[in-house]
Amino acid sequence: METRLRVGVPAFDGEPQPDGSVIPRVPDGKHAIESGNPNLPFLLRMIPVPRNCVAQIEITRLIHVETNSPPITPVPTRELQETEDGRRSVKETLIPRGPGFERNGFWPVEPLEISYAAQGTQRWARIVFHPLQYNPVQGMLRWNKSIEARLVWNEQKLGSE
């Protein structure tokens, strides 16, 4: 049993920051995966999982373009602060750069990832597509314009994952 998946990002934009870095944006993209790592957008799809199965991702087609990039802003952390008058507020704070900035390779490593979630008796596959991957050492941005993949569902024994 398999599920076919096709995702495309026809364009992206960079939101300039005061320090000269940028935060890339894509249509319908979400942000903030891990504080300290490059602030790159991702797209999320939720797919119901067939009973007692796990999926293996097979990328069948990937169209990408690599280009030079200005520095990408790290994902900030959020801290709860209390003002003098006792009100609380959330403040974004930059933390030391995370592992995504330390490697000479693209981050995230894979353009497509899968994890599982349960809601009551239903299981869901959380498919994360990374339309942009960043190599901070070389200052390169990989734009994954289009990806096609197969999710091959393999039955598993109960109680193991």
Where are these regions (language model features)?
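Extracellular pro-sequences of secreted precursors
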Residues: 1-161
